[in-house]
């Protein structure tokens, strides 16, 4: 029989806290053949694809900006941010407008996704910690993995999806 150490107990409590903190409502969406989710409280609006004005000398995943009722909102393509193959935009492609914390306060940011699925109310028991993928991969933007109807949905911390440099670039675009 395997003996548990104090360290094992600490890790178990941390995992339990992470799972309980992850419980709540998530907007789920598709990228390629995968399903992702972000906390509903971070979502401000879901809109159909509209014209995006490109901004020169930005990384490829920063598509540009949109005019949202007189407010300039930066837009990123999550496919490109995650290193997935680029795809043509379709009728289902949409922009999820989220609110993230920028250098000088809250910032609206649009994310282009292949399509929105549904809002799920997830219990802590439906969420598992992110697996350990090894040293090469930090996965700091993953909240966990939700098990729903025999499928896995990847839960994202939208605040951490963008790197510090991305947030700096977005803040510069808005000045």
Model-predicted segments: where are they?
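An acidic, low-aromatic, low-complexity terminal/linker signal
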Residues: 1-175
